Amino acid sequence: MANTQAMATSFKGELLNAYHNFSATNPARTVNTADSFKAALYLASATVNATTTAYSATGEVTGTNYTAGGITITSWNAPTTSGTTGYTTPTASFTYTTVTLSTAFDAVLVYNNSQGNRAVSVHTFGSQTVTAGTFTLTMPTNAAGTALINIA
């Protein structure tokens, strides 16, 4: 089995039902509070992909100073559009500080922990291990075609 980079198929339908709020300013909701999102790391032997509907500890990394469920994504750039693409990117890199993750991992699941841990997207990268170090996933430029979340 292998992890596959993809936007969760369930996320696409959930957007139409207003489950996910990436912005504190949302005219579609009466309460202007952004949802809380997290980023969990997954083993290279796991299977997270477009069919992943929610966060699960199955296949998630374990190790020193890594908290099950991953890290909280502190904030997102305001969702916007350009041409026919809607997009947003977290405002800061994903940083896992002083961790030891001895088993190879190669994916991060972004999920909405305010809405039943619903999956948003899976992002893959080269297989990694970390020994008493900081692992950082640098965020892409927040623009159409490069943002972490692109809906075309």
Language-model regions, residue ranges each:
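Small cysteine-rich, disulfide-bonded extracellular modules of the LU/uPAR three-finger superfamily
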Residues: M1-D106, N113-A152
